[in-house]
UniProtKB/Swiss-Prot annotation:
Residues of the signal peptide: 1-18
Gene name linked to the record: AVNLB
Organism listed in the record: Triticum aestivum (Wheat)
Coiled coil ranges: none
Identification of the protein by name: Avenin-like b1
Keyword Metal-binding: no
A GO molecular function held by the record: nutrient reservoir activity
Amino acid sequence: MKVFILALLALTATTAIAQLETTCSQGFGQYQQQQQPGQRQLLEQMKPCVAFLQQQCRPLRMPFLQTQVEQLSSCQIVQHQCCQQLAQIPERIRCHAIHSVVEAIMQQQSQQQWQERQQQAQHKSMRMLLENLSLMCNIYVPVQCQQQQQMGQQQQQQQLQEQLTPCATFLQHQCSPVTVPFPQIPVDQPTSCQNVQHQCCRQLSQIPEQFRCQAIHNVAEAIRQQQPQQQWQGMYQPQQPAQHESIRMSLQALRSMCNIYIPVQCPAPTAYNIPMVATCTSGAC
């Protein structure tokens, strides 16, 4: 009888401990979710900031107010909502929230408008955005936000450039036909150029369409840096039609070679006079 009572007490204690651990785990999980809002939740919170920064608000017309008084406008209301939401976001994730706002604005703008902006202009826009929010809301925004944005863009460009290394190799004529002494029967032999061309097209197809222009420009920049300095001195002059023609021809070569969609407005941001090859035919580049 005593053994049965002791066993019953032990079972009751074990069940209580298990329930307590489960409750604590669930509570801690809910606490983590509350402390670390996701991307969608942050974007929902920052919607007033997106509307304000896009200048989608307009002053309210109140013709019935004849006296010269400061009239509330929809812009002022949205601005107040933006600052209120930003103040409620913890300091450690304000950078992430601001980056979400910038990304949302970029996605809503036309693709061509954003592709025609240089990297320095984007850095300047990010810096001005941070300064404006800090002054407008009289709230602390970490200084390293801009540094994180620059590092993120540099890492993205480096990753795109590494993905398209086969394209740079192919476009620079650095591939050569493979020597195959056998068989003696004349057949279409695979060449290193064709292999590199296949790798180039495969990598380019894996890059999302909205990033292909930037990726191709990164390839052009990599080729330019590898060429002798004297060859490239004074050649970056976007106003020269010949250089626009060169980058246009290179884009056409990649389009036809890979049979892949590349936005037509790609030539706008940069223009490099780079020797290009359209395709590998008959075992030669």
